[in-house]
Design a protein with these regions (language model features):
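Membrane-embedded beta-strand positions of outer-membrane beta-barrel proteins
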Residues: 12-16, 75-77, 103, 112-114, ...
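Outer-membrane beta-barrel "beta-signal"
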Residues: 129-141
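Outer-membrane beta-barrel architecture
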Residues: 1, 59-61, 76, 100-104, ...
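Solvent-exposed loop segments that connect transmembrane elements
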Residues: 23-45
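Short loop/turn motifs that connect adjacent beta-strands in outer-membrane beta-barrel proteins
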Residues: 4-12, 65-74, 104-106
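Transmembrane beta-strands of outer-membrane beta-barrel pores
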Residues: 16-22, 62-66, 79-85, 107-109, ...
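Short sequence motifs at beta-strands and strand-loop junctions characteristic
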Residues: 46-54, 93-95, 127-129
Length: 141
């Protein structure tokens, strides 16, 4: 509570995404797009594109000005969850979850961002065996 009160601003963001494919044949008749990592499955198996898929993403981000002199810090937390179904572009995968932690720093014209994302072990996820670390810097002139 104290951290949020001392923040210059705090942003809470919720995004909900879905995909509906109206004329997708039943999986007993024809299946579409399961990643080749999982091989050819039996008819009716999971992991193939479904007619409906949805998920959500929650983000919390706060800005703390003048933390050390004129340096501002911006920590962030992002959670993503594929709730149901498999989208045609792999953006929504049932039971796939990720957690991202980040911190940004800005000083005059220089800024830097460091973030780390980890994924759970959803059954048909192609990213469940990896994590993601990112560092970027920017100088405005």
């Amino acid at each position: 509570r104290v951290l949020f009160r001392s923040a210059q601003k705090t942003i809470v963001s919720t995004q909900i995404g879905s995909e509906f494919i109206s004329d997708l044949p039943d999986q007993e008749d024809m299946r579409f797009r399961r990643h080749t990592n999982f091989g050819v499955g039996e008819l009716g198996e999971d992991g193939y594109v479904t007619d409906f898929s949805w998920g959500y993403q929650l983000t919390l981000k706060s800005t703390y000005a003048n933390v050390i002199g004129p340096v501002a810090l911006t920590p962030s937390l992002t959670m993503k969850h594929g709730v149901e179904g498999y989208s045609s572009d792999d953006a929504l995968q049932e039971d796939e979850r990720s957690l991202g932690l980040g911190v940004g720093m800005s000083y005059k014209k220089l800024s830097a961002d460091l973030s780390y994302t980890t994924y759970n072990d959803a059954k048909y996820s192609v990213v469940n065996d990896r994590d993601y670390l990112s560092l970027s810097t920017t100088y405005n002139f």
